[in-house]
Design a protein with these regions (language model features):
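Gly/Ala-rich beta-loop-alpha elbow adjacent to hydrolase catalytic centers
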Residues: 96-100, 104
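Short alpha-helix in the alpha/beta-hydrolase fold that links the catalytic acid
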Residues: 214-223
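Catalytic active-site module of serine/aspartate enzymes centered on a nucleophile-bearing elbow/loop
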Residues: 231-265
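N-terminal cap/lid segment of alpha/beta-hydrolase-fold proteins
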Residues: 1-15
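Conserved alpha/beta-hydrolase
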Residues: 34, 39-62
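Catalytic nucleophile-loop/oxyanion-hole region of alpha/beta-hydrolase
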Residues: 29-31, 58-84, 88
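Flexible "cap/lid" loop of the alpha/beta hydrolase fold
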Residues: 109-144
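Short beta-strand/loop motif that positions the catalytic acidic residue
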Residues: 198, 204-206, 210
Length: 265
């Protein structure tokens, strides 16, 4: 699908008589194909799902692991939302995990045209790995490559999940500071500057044992946004990828329940 002059990998998962459309946004260095179980759970509950690979990731065209501006993912998602809304007269919900959680949170302070947002382990504040670049200035180091090291017993307590992550050819082995700094510094700064603009119903989820993005980030975000319809839940036995850890079935059930409650209003 052509979005902002780039061919994006976009896959629609259709159902009969859908209640709503859920658009999935994945995290840094991964791809949308890792969310099959969530797609299946949403389809089973009569939600059509649209998943896509972010710019610089997966099967989307263009240089991998790079980003010109933190604004690009927001505008890419916005155009996708407009396409989805033009094709189906249905409520639209956004789901995002980790950097994808940051992206949907940023979307929420920029646009107000979706019916709800589900934000999982969002990097909504400055993670420790990028703090040095905040001091130095990431734009001066945008050409530097960083090795992906998330699968270091930090993604999930299920070993097979980390093994599959490492073996997956669509996951990035390296990414550039232009991507990490652009999103985790520039994007985070933008989000926190505009928190008062966030008005969309939101469900915030986080692993209680997350060592990549501290759960305190989600608690902080929850407390700072002035939204009437907001919920938060921690999964105390899970690491960063709550959808791939030991509480994953409960997470999927909670997401469906949250959506059902709002779609039926």
């Amino acid at each position: 699908m052509l979005i902002n002059d780039t061919i994006f990998f976009v896959k629609n998962h259709e159902v009969e008589a859908p209640k709503a459309t859920v658009i999935l946004t994945h995290g840094i260095a991964e791809h949308s194909g890792r969310y099959e179980k969530l797609v299946d759970a949403l389809n089973a509950a009569s939600y059509r799902v649209v998943r896509y690979d972010l710019r610089g990731h997966g099967q989307t065209e263009g240089p991998k692991g790079k980003l010109k501006s933190y604004k690009q993912p927001i505008e890419d998602l916005h155009q996708l939302v407009q396409i989805v809304k033009s094709e189906f007269n249905l409520p639209v919900y956004l789901f995002g995990h980790s950097m994808g959680g940051l992206i949907v949170d940023m979307y929420g302070v920029t646009y107000h045209d979706v019916d709800g947002i589900i934000s999982s382990a969002a990097a909504s504040h400055y993670v420790k790995d990028v703090v040095p670049f905040k001091v130095i200035g990431y734009k001066w180091l945008s050409f530097v490559k960083l090795k992906t090291n998330f699968a270091d017993h930090k993604l999930s307590s299920i070993r097979e999940v980390e093994e599959r992550y490492i073996e997956d050819p669509l996951n990035l082995k390296y990414y550039y500071i232009s991507l990490a700094g652009g999103m985790m510094l520039g994007g985070v700064r933008y989000l926190n500057k505009h928190l008062k603009s966030f008005k969309t119903p939101i469900y915030i989820l986080h692993g209680g044992k997350d060592e990549i993005v501290p759960k305190a980030f989600s608690q902080r975000f929850y407390e700072l946004i002035d939204v009437l319809d907001k919920d938060i839940k921690f999964y105390n036995q899970s690491l960063h990828e709550i959808l791939n850890d030991i509480e994953q079935e409960q997470v999927r059930a909670d997401i469906v329940a949250w959506l059902d409650k709002r779609v039926k209003k």
